[in-house]
Amino acid sequence: MSLHIHRPHGHTVAQTLLALLCALLAMLFTFSLAGCNRVADAAPSSDHTAVPVRVPNDEIVGQEVAVLTEAPNVPPAITRTHATRVIVNLDVIEKTMRLADGVDYTMWTFGGSMPGRFIRVREGDQVELHLKNDEHSTMPHNIDLHAVTGPGGGAKSSLTIPGGESVFTFAALNPGLYVYHCATAPVPMHIANGMYGMILVEPKAGLPKVDREFYVMQSEFYTHGKFGEKGLQTLDMEKGIDERPTYVVFNGAVGSLTGDKALQAKVGERVRLFVGNGGPNLVSSFHVIGEVFDNVYTEGGTVASQHNVQTTLVPAGGSAVVEFGVEKPGDLILVDHSIFRAFNKGALGMLHVSGDDNAKVFASLKGLGGTH
């Protein structure tokens, strides 16, 4: 792994020193954790069995720049049959964004969107990740990808001051759907302010063909103001520590998947949802009202281990992949079925299904007024 940090153009000496101090503290925090891990690793074991070290042996052919997408969009499925070098360019941007109607929040983002950009690579690829921290950022940032086998998931090699850039490489060894997030101290603050996203490592054989793929990520916000209180809101650390979120939302805002922003599908199509949970605290009880999941890839693994599932748990810092066919037109409702979160804190979205009706699937025979 390699690391490059430079002093940003236009910053005063004081600003640069402050950023360096923050970076030093974050590095000390990271190194202390690494030291603890080394002590644990060094402990003797009486029944130690050698585990073969996995060495990437895929021939790397050429290179390409990764297509990164904003939620709910997903990059196209990978059609190549060989491993390649994938260049991922990811910018950290701190910006004020809408959290709810009349409510703003200064989000710390990967790529300027909430959640962070969706990254799609193939098992066996060599990934070269360039992390740039915007010169107007107030903090150093880094990235920990749960798909990475290496120190801190990349965090140790990517600590980046405002205006700087870090570069590291990793082999995409394990297929699956993974969360990535900032791991700069204080880690809970960075995650609570929006620093998370998803990376999909497609299996070499690819995924089963579907008609639609969407990116949905749940998370919480802990604001000083009450739910719906107007104006610019800021992080309430005490609420975060006590796990009392003001908002629980999909894709970074109340209403991000409703109205004209609702997901779209047609009768007869198969839908795949890549579902993530940025946390920082809660486990999601993910459910789609009006549908049953035909296949669930539990915790983002590559095997559809469950079928005909009503609700699946998505842990903080974890994921799930769900697939289902849509047989009936109308609005399907995405919720966290810890139901107060859906109707009182914002964890609610819609999938609008258009097409011909099918009374054999469902028909209303008697309305509220007693008419047929």
Where are these regions (language model features)?
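N-terminal secretory signal peptides that target proteins for export/translocation
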Residues: M1-A14
